[in-house]
């Protein structure tokens, strides 16, 4: 295991329902990456954008080499093949770790999954398969998974994927809510990179914002 190295995987919704939030998503992502460039330790970043299909924007790139995302990278379109994006990313990262030298496997692996709607387009993976994959990686290797959802019951949806209620949160799907998401996720990543426990209150600010501005 390689100490002080963290594998970070972002799975970001770019389906048509994200229309109007492109600038906020791009700005929030870039701000988060800049914060992580300044953090202690090393990090490899993978970014998967999904609609009907998944597009890998970054494949295990050193965080310090990530260039700012632009509107050429992030363009909304299509439906929501969330399960295919999650399953494909877990399969890829898992295989990389499986065949790597033990001393090269990152000390920490963390997934940040963001979606603003229900799964409606996957054809390679179903919720049962993804749940099996996530539960295995959590139990055997200690991987962390955060699930941020809008316009759905995020906790219930995450539970179908094997992600606990303490790692799932509903957010307000607007400019302010999107910006807050990236701030909070960056804080959570920093905790994991420092080997600090990721407490259930990591999502407190998002919870409070959601309840204050129209959530139930």
How should each PLM-predicted stretch be described?
Residues 1-216:
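Acidic, low-complexity intrinsically disordered regions
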């Amino acid at each position: 295991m390689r100490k002080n190295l963290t594998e970070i995987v972002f799975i970001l919704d770019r389906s048509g329902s994200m229309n109007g939030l492109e600038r906020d998503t791009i700005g929030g992502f870039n701000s988060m990456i800049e914060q992580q460039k300044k953090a202690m330790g090393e990090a490899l970043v993978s970014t998967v954008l999904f609609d009907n299909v998944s597009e890998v924007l970054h494949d295990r790139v050193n965080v310090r080499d990530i260039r700012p995302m632009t509107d050429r990278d992030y363009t909304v379109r299509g439906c929501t093949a969330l399960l295919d994006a999650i399953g494909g990313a877990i399969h890829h990262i898992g295989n990389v770790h499986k065949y790597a030298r033990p001393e090269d496997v990152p000390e920490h692996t963390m997934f940040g999954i963001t979606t603003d709607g229900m799964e409606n387009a996957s054809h390679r993976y179903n919720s049962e398969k993804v749940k099996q994959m996530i539960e295995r990686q959590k139990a055997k290797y200690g991987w962390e998974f955060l699930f941020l959802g809008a316009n759905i019951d995020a906790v219930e949806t995450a539970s179908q994927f094997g992600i606990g209620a303490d790692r799932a949160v509903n957010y307000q799907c607007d400019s302010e809510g999107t910006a807050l998401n990236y701030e909070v996720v960056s804080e959570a990543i920093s905790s994991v990179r420092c080997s600090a426990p990721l407490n259930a209150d990591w999502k407190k600010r998002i919870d409070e914002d959601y309840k204050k501005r129209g959530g139930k």
